[in-house]
């Protein structure tokens, strides 16, 4: 069984509506309840920033820093894991811009935010993701890449490198440049990183599909059939990566006039999509009811949590924002049971603590009240 990694203490300074907060946390289920706008999701956002990226809201750091503060913010977490305790801190100082985020691990400055993935993996579900299957493909790619990152820590940097190269190519296209050497250099980098991204996505989908197949087909959360739509993802499953890179590089070179007319790059992993079907109903997820879509999404995340534990040797930390609002009583009880079985730390939020009543005695209940957090009465 994977070793549990959990946050035992979380400290926030000038973060969102928290001027200063320090809370001790239990290793299993943690329930944050309180009124809308009290700051429950802010706590989940803080935890989500203990991994690379902009967190579950994808907000600019200027928005994350507390209004009325000095413009900076700091987060600190004490982790208890298989290798003992680890201290992780991140934030920005006063006057630092969007690129000024710093990470410290056990007091030492980390090389990059990716170093945090050595110590914890975090995956989240938020109400904004309820429209994942009916919304734009970009949202599904972002969700997929977050799942990949949890088992392949290098994926985030590859995605950043690809995006940077593509922005450079798009600038050349819109500027009307005909400098073949510049194009060739950028397109070579796009081919290398783009194929690596596609291969990582394809591998994640293969592994996750196999994990879903291992689970009972009569469970509370319907099994999903998942696949990828994209030329590169299809090719890397059947051809050597070096051959796919060369094909993609030639396609980029041959498509310059087309892309110049469009003003952007029209081929690559940034155009791919994650396809999901409700297996029992043999129906595309986007055609399912809202409740069925939510159940499918929860099932995928729980299967991914199992996969992450097996692949990394540590249980992921789950952030489940307003998770109980759209699940019936049976599925809520099933979710809580599965979380216990996974032995992972799971942070859940809701306006009504009663929705989590079946967890009484088995979870830590905390009430959030506009900048303060304390034990929930009668919990």
From Swiss-Prot:
Family note: Belongs to the RecF family.
Cross-referenced PROSITE patterns: RECF_1 (PS00617), RECF_2 (PS00618)
Protein name, as recorded: DNA replication and repair protein RecF
Domain of life: Bacteria
Localisation: Cytoplasm
Major localization listed first in the record, in broad terms: cytoplasm
Positions of ATP binding: 34-41
Gene responsible for this protein: recF
SUPFAM superfamilies: P-loop containing nucleoside triphosphate hydrolases
GO MF terms, alphabetically ordered: ATP binding; ATP hydrolysis activity; single-stranded DNA binding
SMART domains xrefs: AAA
Annotated keywords: ATP-binding, Cytoplasm, DNA damage, DNA repair, DNA replication, DNA-binding, Nucleotide-binding, SOS response
HAMAP family: RecF
Positions in coiled-coil regions: none
Any one Gene Ontology BP term: DNA synthesis involved in DNA repair
Entry-linked InterPro entries: AAA+_ATPase, DNA-binding_RecF, DNA-binding_RecF_CS, P-loop_NTPase, RecF/RecN/SMC_N, RecF_2
